[in-house]
Amino acid sequence: MTVDEKKDSLISYRLAQAKEAIDDAAFLFENHRGLRSVVNRIYYAMFYAVLALLVTEPFQGSKHSGVIGYFNKRFVREGIFPPETGKYLNLAFEARQESDYKELFMKKNKS
């Protein structure tokens, strides 16, 4: 398999992950399974889509904040995506952090 074929395969995989996360979010929402899980799946749909895009870039990293930062710098600030896209990605990240780790944040604040 060539490098380009490997990249194409990884892009397809990441986009399939994004689609699955969207489908999961819709199912959870429609079946009243809890907003926390819906927020998580929506964020991950966005994150996987960004990871698919970054396969085409010289980006190395896996931390969510690094991925989002690179996306905003390279694609939003350069006008490839509108500012709202970066804003929504940041909001989804913050909402996912809060919903997934709220209990942890509350314990830290009590200390």
Question: For each predicted feature, which ranges?
Answer:
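Terminal alpha-helical segments
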Residues: 1-111
